[in-house]
């Protein structure tokens, strides 16, 4: 599964960012997502941009997962890395409609790039949903780009559902048709 970051196939109760690197013990109440930014990055080649040599960030194939206070950045997928069931650069959801979901709260998805040119697999560099459910609560989708079919988010089937609440979409773009958001 070349070009992929984290793959989720089971339920994950919660991934929470915002902890100091100097935290000790078991007290999980001392979180500050603004002061202690937790980053999941696809920037494998270390050049602080999403391009060839980098990888996609999160593939949700099954299960329910909740993520709070995490920044996702520099995810990248090329035409060569994309397949019919795995083609996202940021968060890609491809599971059963009833048993696959992800909920993001107070997160940022930024600077992800989909260089995929095949129409069925292009677009949605921040969030691409083939099948399953995505809930975005106070999520910022910033400066993501694609060749076409959605500069930030793409729902690609009748079993793909995205709910957005209090989200910001800014600076997202694509070179083709079907929407910049």
Describe the residue ranges of each PLM region:
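Extracellular beta-strand-rich solenoid/capping regions of secreted or surface-exposed proteins
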Residues: 2-14, 24-68, 73-100, 127-129, ...
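Compositionally biased regions
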Residues: 3, 90, 95, 106, ...
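Right-handed parallel beta-helix
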Residues: 17, 64-76, 98-115, 133-145, ...
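Flexible, solvent-exposed loop segments that connect beta-strands
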Residues: 80-85, 116-121, 176
